[in-house]
Amino acid sequence: MKRQLILEDGSFFVGERFGSLKETTGEVVFNTGMTGYQEILSDPSYCGQIVTMTYPLIGNYGINRDDFEAIRPHVHGFIVKEACVKPSNWRGELTLDEYLKEKGIPGLSGIDTRKLTRLIRQYGTLKGMICGLDVDPVEAAAKLRAMEWPRDQVRRVSTKSAYPSPGRGERIVLIDFGMKHGILRELNKRNCDVIVLPYNATAEEVLGWHPDGVMLSNGPGDPKDVPEAIEMIRGILGKVPLFGICLGHQLFALACGANTEKMKFGHRGSNHPVKDLRTGKVAITSQNHGYTVTHESLSGTRLEVTHIALNDGTVEGLRHLDVPAFTVQYHPEASPGPEDANPLFDEFLALIREFNKKGEVIHA
């Protein structure tokens, strides 16, 4: 069955339907990863987006039980050049098509994904609609241009109540702004005693758990849409070691007086080189973000840039000069992608132990 993708600029792409038949709208973005589509589909950071995979053949190893990053997906659509109909992998239990149908996610295949990607690179991310051929592109484009982005995406994907993931090591409070399970898995590997809190937890609630450290997770949307989190971060700075990832990095920067802005088309993929300015080493990282901390806004703050993206020079890591806190824009847990940056979790635990030695950590 033929379906189409209509963009807000009036352009449209006709392809083959797979997955759900429902009509959908969202921000059309692209991901440059060759693999990891299951983790991408289940990453809450993609809430409200229609994801285009630049690699031409997707679905080769099917869908398994183990590689999900959240209980349910939040993507609004999935676009590929070719969707594999006969996957081959010993763990695979569903085809990509079967999974999308089960979760109600519309898919589109057979379009020129290279042309679509170049369009996004040239003009920036665009609002789009996956729909039937009976929809008029001109009328749909006008509706898309008038459509406003939702501002409550973090609320949609965050846990509604606190829950534990017990361990015998350091107690970590993990703030869930749309947390990937990969972050929790990395903390569990290190035997951390984790308490997951919702995005709107107050500083008093966070400190009430008497944590050894606080982690700020990834999540979707504009960091300025989560003012309560910015206030919470200000309330805990200096009282407990802090480590932020992706959206958590941006919220930390805002809490410290810096600014963020929307990128033209963002960083999404598992092959982004990042340079550590302290060591000169380069790591290949997994990334998924459409906003960035602006260099010029760091002047006058007590933040130091620790990492930059080699492709465009944007800020990829920050460290506070006065308190035990650091953040990165990329995903050290990978899931999917390379694990070059995985030692950052160990760096966080080392920071906690150093903080404890000084007798500064808050306990009951």
UniProtKB/Swiss-Prot annotation:
It catalyses: hydrogencarbonate + L-glutamine + 2 ATP + H2O = carbamoyl phosphate + L-glutamate + 2 ADP + phosphate + 2 H(+). The active site is at 246 (nucleophile), 331, 333. It comes from the Bacteria. L-glutamine binds at residues 45, 219, 221, 247, 250, 288, 290-291. One of its GO terms (molecular function) is glutaminase activity. It is an enzyme of class 6 (ligase). Pathway: Amino-acid biosynthesis; L-arginine biosynthesis; carbamoyl phosphate from bicarbonate: step 1/1; Pyrimidine metabolism; UMP biosynthesis via de novo pathway; (S)-dihydroorotate from bicarbonate: step 1/3. Residues 1-167, 1-171 are annotated as: CPSase. InterPro entries: Anth_synth/Amidotransfase (IPR050472), CarbamoylP_synth_ssu (IPR006274), CarbamoylP_synth_ssu_N (IPR002474), CarbP_synth_ssu_N_sf (IPR036480), Class_I_gatase-like (IPR029062), CPSase_GATase1 (IPR035686), GATASE (IPR017926). The keyword Nucleotide-binding applies. Its EC number is 6.3.5.5. One of its GO terms (biological process) is glutamine metabolic process. Keywords: Amino-acid biosynthesis, Arginine biosynthesis, ATP-binding, Glutamine amidotransferase, Ligase, Nucleotide-binding, Pyrimidine biosynthesis. Residues 171-358 form the Glutamine amidotransferase type-1 domain. The keyword Cytoplasm does not apply. Composed of two chains; the small (or glutamine) chain promotes the hydrolysis of glutamine to ammonia, which is used by the large (or ammonia) chain to synthesize carbamoyl phosphate. Tetramer of heterodimers (alpha,beta)4. Small subunit of the glutamine-dependent carbamoyl phosphate synthetase (CPSase). CPSase catalyzes the formation of carbamoyl phosphate from the ammonia moiety of glutamine, carbonate, and phosphate donated by ATP, constituting the first step of 2 biosynthetic pathways, one leading to arginine and/or urea and the other to pyrimidine nucleotides. The small subunit (glutamine amidotransferase) binds and cleaves glutamine to supply the large subunit with the substrate ammonia. Belongs to the CarA family. This is Carbamoyl phosphate synthase small chain. The lineage of its organism: Bacteria, Bacillati, Bacillota, Bacilli, Bacillales. The gene is carA.
